[in-house]
Amino acid sequence: MKKTELGMDGWIQDLSAKSLSWFPDKLPVEISEELIDCLEEKSMESKLNARVCLHKGPDSALQEMIICQRNDQAHPPKRHPLRDKTFLVLRGTLLVSIFNELGEVIKTWCLQPESKNKVFCVRVPAGVFHCDFALTGTAVHLETTLGPFSPKNDREYLWQDSPENLNRWNAIRNNLVLNNVKND
């Protein structure tokens, strides 16, 4: 990952992360509209998802992140065997779906901030296959889970990488988008 300044003081980039990521230089951490604006701007410029971590580092027991997720970046369903995960949307529309072991959608939520009769937060239990992606150009959400983060055993994907499974995932994603944009 190349070095990218967030545009605000108090943040150190994690150059080893897959997405643009920054950790706080010191605690306590404040989250402002200006910070979220900077995060969205960096995501748009780089064409990557971007996050600021509210915790000190990957070894922290509680992991909280403000994530700007792009709608052109959606990952296939996965589960975290030992950790729950909470999504609380701050901007845009974030779709969260859970799946059974066969890859069938069990339930879907369209998370939106300050919306009438809509859900803005959902917690996915440990061991449940799920996916999350932006329905709007970007969706900014607070994600909370337990640490420490371990990229080797943190997640299990529902399907192995293959062209057939990629086609299956794309069809499911397209169906989720169509059903939730119409009903929104």
Predicted regions and their residues:
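A short, N-terminal "cap"/entry segment at the start of jelly-roll beta-barrel domains
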Residues: 1-61, 107-114, 168-184
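Conserved short histidine dyad/triad with adjacent acidic residue
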Residues: 66-83, 126
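Short strand-connecting beta-turns/loops that link adjacent beta-strands
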Residues: 59-60, 82, 137
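Double-stranded beta-helix
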Residues: 104-116, 129-184
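Short beta-strand His + acidic residue motifs that chelate non-heme Fe in jelly-roll/DSBH
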Residues: 76-78, 96-98, 122-124, 130-135, ...
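Short, surface-exposed charged micro-motifs
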Residues: 66, 86, 131-132
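Glycine- and acidic-residue-biased ligand/ion/polar-headgroup-sensing regions
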Residues: 71, 82-102
